[in-house]
Amino acid sequence: MPDAIMSRIAILGCTLVLVGGWPAAKAQEPPIMLVPHRAIYDLTLGQARDNAQVASVRGRILYDFDGNACEGYTLQFRQVSELDSGEGKVSTSDLRSNTWEDADARRFKFTSENFLDQNLIDTVDGNAEHRASATAINLEKPEHKSLDIGATVVFPTQQMVRVIAAARAGGNILDFPVFDGSDTGDKVYDTLTVIGRKLATDDRKHDDAAAGVAKLDGVPRWPVKISYFEKTGERKNTEQTPVYAIGFELYENGISRALSLDYNDFVVSGKLSSLEIKDVKPCP
Protein backbone atom coordinates (compact mmCIF):
# COMPACT_ATOMS: atom_id res chain seq x y z
CA MET A 1 0.00 0.00 0.00
CA PRO A 2 1.51 3.40 -0.93
CA ASP A 3 3.07 5.17 2.04
CA ALA A 4 1.04 8.36 1.58
CA ILE A 5 -2.19 6.37 1.59
CA MET A 6 -1.20 4.48 4.72
CA SER A 7 -0.40 7.70 6.54
CA ARG A 8 -3.87 9.03 5.76
CA ILE A 9 -5.39 6.25 7.86
CA ALA A 10 -4.13 8.14 10.90
CA ILE A 11 -6.81 10.75 10.37
CA LEU A 12 -9.41 8.45 11.86
CA GLY A 13 -7.56 8.31 15.15
CA CYS A 14 -7.17 12.06 15.11
CA THR A 15 -10.82 12.71 14.44
CA LEU A 16 -11.94 10.53 17.32
CA VAL A 17 -9.80 12.25 19.90
CA LEU A 18 -11.36 12.92 23.33
CA VAL A 19 -12.77 16.31 24.22
CA GLY A 20 -14.83 17.69 27.10
CA GLY A 21 -16.91 20.78 27.73
CA TRP A 22 -17.21 22.11 24.18
CA PRO A 23 -19.99 24.52 23.17
CA ALA A 24 -23.22 22.83 22.21
CA ALA A 25 -24.89 23.19 18.84
CA LYS A 26 -27.79 25.04 20.51
CA ALA A 27 -27.91 26.93 23.79
CA GLN A 28 -30.46 24.56 25.34
CA GLU A 29 -28.42 21.45 24.54
CA PRO A 30 -25.79 20.02 26.91
CA PRO A 31 -22.11 20.44 25.97
CA ILE A 32 -20.59 17.93 23.59
CA MET A 33 -18.78 15.37 25.73
CA LEU A 34 -16.81 12.69 23.89
CA VAL A 35 -15.95 9.75 26.11
CA PRO A 36 -12.38 8.53 26.63
CA HIS A 37 -12.10 5.08 25.14
CA ARG A 38 -9.82 2.40 23.76
CA ALA A 39 -10.99 0.84 20.51
CA ILE A 40 -9.63 -1.83 18.20
CA TYR A 41 -10.77 -2.24 14.59
CA ASP A 42 -10.04 -5.32 12.48
CA LEU A 43 -9.35 -4.49 8.83
CA THR A 44 -10.30 -6.51 5.75
CA LEU A 45 -10.66 -5.78 2.04
CA GLY A 46 -14.18 -4.52 1.43
CA GLN A 47 -14.00 -3.80 -2.30
CA ALA A 48 -11.36 -3.83 -5.05
CA ARG A 49 -12.16 -1.69 -8.07
CA ASP A 50 -11.08 -2.41 -11.66
CA ASN A 51 -7.55 -0.98 -11.50
CA ALA A 52 -6.74 -2.14 -7.98
CA GLN A 53 -3.70 -4.40 -7.66
CA VAL A 54 -4.96 -5.75 -4.37
CA ALA A 55 -6.06 -9.31 -3.66
CA SER A 56 -6.48 -9.08 0.11
CA VAL A 57 -5.96 -6.78 3.07
CA ARG A 58 -5.80 -7.63 6.72
CA GLY A 59 -4.77 -5.55 9.68
CA ARG A 60 -5.73 -3.79 12.85
CA ILE A 61 -6.14 -0.24 14.12
CA LEU A 62 -5.66 0.61 17.78
CA TYR A 63 -6.81 3.90 19.41
CA ASP A 64 -6.19 4.89 22.99
CA PHE A 65 -7.53 8.29 24.14
CA ASP A 66 -7.09 9.99 27.49
CA GLY A 67 -6.92 13.37 29.18
CA ASN A 68 -9.10 16.03 30.73
CA ALA A 69 -10.13 19.65 30.31
CA CYS A 70 -7.16 20.84 32.38
CA GLU A 71 -4.26 18.90 30.88
CA GLY A 72 -5.53 18.50 27.33
CA TYR A 73 -6.17 15.33 25.40
CA THR A 74 -3.82 12.62 24.17
CA LEU A 75 -4.17 10.02 21.45
CA GLN A 76 -1.97 6.96 21.05
CA PHE A 77 -2.57 5.35 17.70
CA ARG A 78 -1.16 2.37 15.84
CA GLN A 79 -2.24 0.79 12.59
CA VAL A 80 -0.69 -2.32 11.07
CA SER A 81 -1.79 -3.46 7.61
CA GLU A 82 -0.74 -6.34 5.41
CA LEU A 83 -1.51 -6.00 1.72
CA ASP A 84 -1.32 -8.90 -0.74
CA SER A 85 -1.06 -7.97 -4.41
CA GLY A 86 -2.06 -11.49 -5.48
CA GLU A 87 1.22 -11.86 -7.37
CA GLY A 88 3.30 -13.23 -4.54
CA LYS A 89 4.11 -9.80 -3.09
CA VAL A 90 2.98 -9.00 0.45
CA SER A 91 3.77 -5.63 2.07
CA THR A 92 3.33 -4.73 5.72
CA SER A 93 2.88 -1.15 6.89
CA ASP A 94 3.13 -0.12 10.54
CA LEU A 95 2.08 3.45 11.36
CA ARG A 96 2.46 4.77 14.92
CA SER A 97 1.50 8.22 16.12
CA ASN A 98 0.99 10.24 19.29
CA THR A 99 -0.85 13.55 19.50
CA TRP A 100 -1.77 16.07 22.16
CA GLU A 101 -4.31 18.87 21.83
CA ASP A 102 -5.18 21.42 24.48
CA ALA A 103 -8.74 21.82 25.71
CA ASP A 104 -9.21 25.08 23.80
CA ALA A 105 -8.14 23.52 20.47
CA ARG A 106 -5.48 26.21 20.09
CA ARG A 107 -2.32 24.09 20.38
CA PHE A 108 -1.56 20.74 18.80
CA LYS A 109 1.52 18.48 19.12
CA PHE A 110 2.15 15.48 16.91
CA THR A 111 4.73 12.74 16.32
CA SER A 112 4.60 9.75 14.00
CA GLU A 113 6.72 6.92 12.63
CA ASN A 114 5.88 4.96 9.49
CA PHE A 115 7.47 1.56 8.87
CA LEU A 116 7.27 -0.43 5.64
CA ASP A 117 8.29 -4.08 5.92
CA GLN A 118 9.94 -3.24 9.28
CA ASN A 119 12.03 -0.44 7.76
CA LEU A 120 11.51 3.10 9.06
CA ILE A 121 10.65 5.30 6.09
CA ASP A 122 9.08 8.43 7.62
CA THR A 123 9.35 10.31 10.91
CA VAL A 124 7.38 13.44 11.78
CA ASP A 125 7.70 15.59 14.91
CA GLY A 126 6.14 19.02 15.30
CA ASN A 127 3.56 21.32 16.79
CA ALA A 128 0.99 23.85 15.63
CA GLU A 129 -0.68 26.83 17.28
CA HIS A 130 -3.58 29.06 16.33
CA ARG A 131 -2.67 32.75 16.43
CA ALA A 132 -4.58 35.93 15.66
CA SER A 133 -4.20 35.94 11.88
CA ALA A 134 -2.70 32.53 11.04
CA THR A 135 -1.84 29.08 12.33
CA ALA A 136 1.87 28.55 12.96
CA ILE A 137 3.49 25.16 12.33
CA ASN A 138 6.93 24.28 13.66
CA LEU A 139 8.57 21.03 12.55
CA GLU A 140 11.60 19.25 14.01
CA LYS A 141 11.31 16.21 11.71
CA PRO A 142 11.60 15.28 8.89
CA GLU A 143 13.43 18.62 8.78
CA HIS A 144 13.52 21.86 10.73
CA LYS A 145 10.83 24.04 9.21
CA SER A 146 8.42 26.81 10.21
CA LEU A 147 5.44 28.03 8.24
CA ASP A 148 2.11 29.79 8.63
CA ILE A 149 -1.16 28.43 7.31
CA GLY A 150 -4.64 29.89 7.22
CA ALA A 151 -6.35 31.02 10.41
CA THR A 152 -9.50 29.05 9.48
CA VAL A 153 -7.74 25.68 9.65
CA VAL A 154 -9.04 23.40 12.40
CA PHE A 155 -7.33 20.65 14.39
CA PRO A 156 -8.77 17.11 14.64
CA THR A 157 -10.67 17.51 17.91
CA GLN A 158 -12.39 20.67 16.75
CA GLN A 159 -13.18 18.95 13.47
CA MET A 160 -15.08 16.15 15.16
CA VAL A 161 -16.87 18.52 17.53
CA ARG A 162 -18.08 20.52 14.53
CA VAL A 163 -19.37 17.34 12.90
CA ILE A 164 -21.31 16.32 16.01
CA ALA A 165 -22.65 19.84 16.54
CA ALA A 166 -23.86 19.95 12.93
CA ALA A 167 -25.45 16.50 13.25
CA ARG A 168 -27.27 17.57 16.41
CA ALA A 169 -28.62 20.62 14.61
CA GLY A 170 -29.84 18.59 11.64
CA GLY A 171 -27.11 19.77 9.27
CA ASN A 172 -25.78 17.52 6.55
CA ILE A 173 -22.85 19.28 4.84
CA LEU A 174 -19.62 20.73 6.28
CA ASP A 175 -16.69 22.11 4.28
CA PHE A 176 -13.49 23.41 5.91
CA PRO A 177 -9.69 22.86 5.94
CA VAL A 178 -8.07 20.52 8.48
CA PHE A 179 -4.52 20.15 9.78
CA ASP A 180 -3.76 16.87 11.57
CA GLY A 181 0.04 16.53 11.33
CA SER A 182 -0.13 13.54 8.99
CA ASP A 183 1.95 12.83 5.88
CA THR A 184 4.98 15.16 5.97
CA GLY A 185 3.62 17.22 8.86
CA ASP A 186 3.07 20.40 6.84
CA LYS A 187 0.02 19.63 4.70
CA VAL A 188 -3.45 21.08 5.01
CA TYR A 189 -6.39 19.18 3.54
CA ASP A 190 -9.74 20.54 2.42
CA THR A 191 -12.49 18.34 3.82
CA LEU A 192 -16.07 17.72 2.78
CA THR A 193 -18.27 16.04 5.39
CA VAL A 194 -21.65 14.53 4.56
CA ILE A 195 -23.90 13.61 7.50
CA GLY A 196 -26.82 11.25 7.01
CA ARG A 197 -30.09 11.03 8.91
CA LYS A 198 -29.93 10.08 12.56
CA LEU A 199 -30.18 6.34 13.05
CA ALA A 200 -32.73 4.82 15.39
CA THR A 201 -31.24 4.47 18.88
CA ASP A 202 -33.05 1.16 19.39
CA ASP A 203 -31.58 -0.31 16.19
CA ARG A 204 -28.44 -1.79 17.69
CA LYS A 205 -28.38 -5.36 16.43
CA HIS A 206 -24.68 -5.08 15.70
CA ASP A 207 -22.27 -7.97 15.24
CA ASP A 208 -19.36 -6.02 16.68
CA ALA A 209 -18.08 -4.79 20.05
CA ALA A 210 -20.69 -2.01 20.20
CA ALA A 211 -23.45 -4.59 20.69
CA GLY A 212 -24.74 -4.87 24.22
CA VAL A 213 -22.67 -1.97 25.61
CA ALA A 214 -24.93 -0.35 28.19
CA LYS A 215 -23.17 3.02 27.95
CA LEU A 216 -24.28 3.26 24.32
CA ASP A 217 -27.95 2.72 25.10
CA GLY A 218 -29.98 5.65 23.81
CA VAL A 219 -26.92 7.49 22.44
CA PRO A 220 -27.74 9.12 19.07
CA ARG A 221 -25.61 8.17 16.08
CA TRP A 222 -25.32 9.22 12.45
CA PRO A 223 -23.75 7.85 9.25
CA VAL A 224 -20.88 10.16 8.32
CA LYS A 225 -18.52 10.37 5.35
CA ILE A 226 -15.49 12.67 5.35
CA SER A 227 -13.52 13.21 2.13
CA TYR A 228 -10.02 14.72 2.11
CA PHE A 229 -8.81 16.77 -0.86
CA GLU A 230 -5.49 18.32 -1.81
CA LYS A 231 -5.72 21.97 -0.82
CA THR A 232 -5.31 24.13 -3.92
CA GLY A 233 -6.98 27.30 -2.66
CA GLU A 234 -9.60 27.10 -5.39
CA ARG A 235 -11.51 23.81 -5.05
CA LYS A 236 -14.51 24.65 -7.20
CA ASN A 237 -14.73 21.47 -9.24
CA THR A 238 -17.24 19.16 -7.58
CA GLU A 239 -15.78 16.30 -9.64
CA GLN A 240 -12.38 16.54 -7.94
CA THR A 241 -11.33 13.13 -6.64
CA PRO A 242 -10.48 13.02 -2.94
CA VAL A 243 -7.13 11.69 -1.81
CA TYR A 244 -8.92 9.57 0.72
CA ALA A 245 -12.37 9.22 2.28
CA ILE A 246 -13.65 7.60 5.44
CA GLY A 247 -17.16 6.53 6.30
CA PHE A 248 -18.41 5.44 9.72
CA GLU A 249 -21.30 5.48 12.13
CA LEU A 250 -20.59 8.19 14.69
CA TYR A 251 -22.10 8.17 18.15
CA GLU A 252 -22.75 11.49 19.85
CA ASN A 253 -20.13 10.58 22.47
CA GLY A 254 -17.39 10.17 19.85
CA ILE A 255 -17.29 6.39 19.46
CA SER A 256 -17.33 5.08 15.89
CA ARG A 257 -18.19 1.75 14.34
CA ALA A 258 -18.56 0.23 10.85
CA LEU A 259 -15.56 1.92 9.23
CA SER A 260 -15.09 2.23 5.48
CA LEU A 261 -11.69 3.51 4.32
CA ASP A 262 -11.84 4.46 0.64
CA TYR A 263 -8.52 4.81 -1.23
CA ASN A 264 -10.16 5.21 -4.66
CA ASP A 265 -8.76 1.95 -6.09
CA PHE A 266 -9.99 -0.13 -3.18
CA VAL A 267 -11.99 0.08 0.04
CA VAL A 268 -10.99 -1.33 3.43
CA SER A 269 -13.64 -2.27 5.99
CA GLY A 270 -12.98 -1.83 9.70
CA LYS A 271 -14.99 -3.83 12.23
CA LEU A 272 -15.00 -2.72 15.87
CA SER A 273 -13.64 -5.83 17.61
CA SER A 274 -12.90 -4.40 21.06
CA LEU A 275 -14.20 -1.39 22.98
CA GLU A 276 -13.28 -0.15 26.44
CA ILE A 277 -15.04 2.99 27.65
CA LYS A 278 -12.92 4.68 30.31
CA ASP A 279 -13.82 6.87 33.24
CA VAL A 280 -13.26 10.58 32.75
CA LYS A 281 -10.32 11.77 34.82
CA PRO A 282 -11.23 14.79 36.98
CA CYS A 283 -9.06 17.87 36.87
CA PRO A 284 -6.57 18.00 39.77
Language-model region placement:
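Mature, soluble, non-transmembrane domains
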Residues: T111-P284
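Hydrophobic/aromatic beta-strand elements that line small-molecule binding cavities or substrate pockets
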Residues: G59-D66, D94-E101, G126-A128, I246-E249
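A short, structured loop/turn motif at beta-sheet edges
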Residues: E29-V35, D64-Y73, W100-R106, L216-V219, ...
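Beta-strand elements of well-folded, non-transmembrane domains
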Residues: L43-Q47, Y63-A69, S81-S85, T99-A103, ...
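Bacterial N-terminal signal peptides that target proteins for export
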Residues: P2-L12
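N-terminal cleavable signal peptides for secretion/export
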Residues: A25-G72, Q76-E87
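Bacterial N-terminal signal peptides
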Residues: I11-G21
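Hydrophobic/aromatic-rich structural module bridging two neighboring secondary-structure elements via a short loop
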Residues: F77-R131
